[in-house]
Each structure stands twice: as C-alpha cells, then as structure tokens.
C-alpha cells in the first residue's frame, strides 16, 4: 500500500481570507497538479472558472487515497482546505485519521520544528527545494502559474522521498539534550518508532551519513491494531523512556 503524498500552495495563512492556488498529488505511478486560481485582467489572484469541478476532483483524490502524507499536512494543509473549501467535518476527520505527517513525527522526536529542506539536507538527498511558501505567494501574485505548479509538485515528490525512508536522520532536539545531557548516549541510537495503520518508521537523533540511510518504508501489518497513525511507541519501552515521552512538546 503506497503513500499518497500531496501539498498545497496558498495566497496567505488565513483560510477565511486567502485562496488555495494550486495542489499537487504524488504517488510512484502518478503525479497530478490542480490549479484553483488565476490572474484577472488587473493582475489580481481570483478563483479559476472551473473551480468547483477541480476542487471536487482534488478532494475525491484525498477521499480515495489509502494513506495521506503531507509535510505539516495535519497542522496546515488539511485545516486550510477544510475552511477554504468548506469541507464537511466528517470528511475532514477521515483525512486526519489516515494521515501520516512526517513533520509532526519529527517535531515529537526533537521538540522543535524545521523545514522540509532541512530533512532533505540531513538525509543525503541530491536535490533541494527551490523556494519557500513565501515565494509561492509571490509567484501567485506575479502570475507565474507554471513555476508555482512546478514548485508545488516538487514539494509533493520530496515529501514522498522523505516519508518512504526506513531510517530518517533528524537534528538533535532541545528536549533530548535537556533530559539526557548528564549521561552518555549514542547520538545515532534509535529512540522510538512512529506506528501507522500500515507502516512504521524509526527515527534517529543526530545527523547520519548518507550511507546509513536505508530506503524503503516497510509494511508492518502486525502493528495495525495499535491505534491512529500518530501513535508513538518506544522501541525499548522502559519506564524512563515512557516518562520522557510524556514530557515531549505536543
């Protein structure tokens, strides 16, 4: 069962006032970009003429996907489209329940936030993002729709590349240093794994050489009963580690 990776670009951060401009969907076998906005004669960003048809086609893809994966999808992308596209709450909840959010998992692991570009650099990828969300806003205002679509599509692809790594290097988080700075520990030791409905991914604290990154997010059918895609379990569930996990920033 493959991940369905996706990303959106917007004209700002307030879904009640701003627009979704483009959305990209990526699987190993198919890539789709939806454009929801265009420039009018005065250069203003407005909804495209067939907005409703494209919106429903995109939302249906989210409905049909077995597992959704977006970088900060549960924190930004899903809430934004839920409001901007006026989506039924039950439909939104189904998306949340089947979402695998590598950003949220990394934040729990380190107690900090960082960009997709940071993860790409730490894990030895030969590619990098060519812009940021702020750049995407400027591209829309400048009417650079082709460039914006390409940028969004690349984000969705990179999210797939990051999300399908068996081992993922993360920058060491403040929460771990504060909790364990008085004892020796291996910076490359596997600390915990994130268990999803069909997958598990092991996170390592500390920067790993590229050779240590093992591709392939392996199916783990024996753990499908453990709960939602965001449930985190210790590989070595000692009382000390269980207590530490409770103190992690949410």
Regions found by a protein language model. Name each.
Residues 1-250:
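DEDD superfamily 3′-5′ metal-dependent exonuclease/proofreading module
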């Amino acid at each position: 069962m493959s991940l369905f990776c996706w990303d959106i670009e917007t004209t700002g951060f307030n879904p009640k006032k701003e627009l979704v401009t483009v959305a990209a969907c990526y699987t190993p076998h198919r890539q789709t970009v939806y454009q929801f906005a265009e420039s009018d004669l005065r250069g203003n960003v407005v909804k495209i003429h067939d907005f409703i048809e494209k919106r429903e086609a995109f939302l249906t893809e989210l409905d049909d996907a077995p597992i959704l994966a977006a970088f900060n999808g549960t924190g930004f992308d899903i809430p934004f489209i839920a409001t901007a596209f006026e989506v039924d709450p039950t439909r939104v909840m189904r998306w949340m329940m089947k979402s695998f959010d590598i950003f949220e998992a990394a934040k729990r692991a380190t107690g900090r936030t960082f960009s997709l570009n940071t993860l790409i650099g730490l894990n030895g990828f030969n590619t990098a993002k060519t812009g940021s969300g702020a750049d995407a806003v400027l591209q829309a205002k400048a009417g650079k729709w082709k460039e914006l679509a390409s940028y969004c599509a690349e984000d969705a692809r990179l999210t797939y590349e990051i999300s399908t790594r068996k081992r993922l290097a993360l920058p060491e988080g403040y929460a771990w240093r504060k909790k364990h700075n008085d004892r020796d520990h291996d910076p490359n030791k596997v600390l915990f794994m994130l268990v999803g409905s069909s997958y598990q991914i092991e996170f390592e604290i500390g920067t790993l050489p590229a050779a240590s990154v093992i591709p392939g997010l392996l199916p783990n059918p024996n753990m499908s009963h453990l709960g939602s895609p965001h449930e985190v379990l210790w590989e070595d569930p000692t009382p000390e580690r269980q207590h530490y996990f409770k103190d992690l920033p949410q």
